[in-house]
Amino acid sequence: METWVKAPFLKEASVLIIGECIQSAFPKLWDEFAKNRITLTSCPQAEGFSGLTEKLATLIKCSGPKEIAILTIDGSPHCNMLHASANAASFLTETDIPTKHLVIAREGDVRELSSETVRLSRYLHLVEKCIQRCPDLIDDLGSLSLEHRSAERRRTQCLMIHDESEA
């Protein structure tokens, strides 16, 4: 996120922080969400959690934006970091700036997530608890994640080999 955190245009502005890859992957969504907002780009993979959090906290302290919206790709661990950084920056600055967590889901539809959803994603034992209570989430995951489908294929192949060796 390359900007001076005290830039006059940030003072009490509506700020959109958007994953860098979105402009090329979803240009119409970029245009739609950038309307009437100061738009900053970030590549969480390149910038890292600590750097992003520090930059966001400093921006909040120095410029006091009216609101912050984060728009990223759903399913990207790097993009998840941008949402977590926004929550951490609010915590560190002890401010309650309205924050929207937005993700571009499959087929390009945008979904708003609560700050609590972002926080929950950091606690894997709680995510596991959610899966145990709602196992059909794994079916949903299968429709979204190539990694999951590949792991399931390998697991099935191992089970078949194991069954053949016992026969």
Identify the meaning behind each predicted range.
Residues 1-167:
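Iron-sulfur-associated redox domains of electron-transfer enzymes in respiratory
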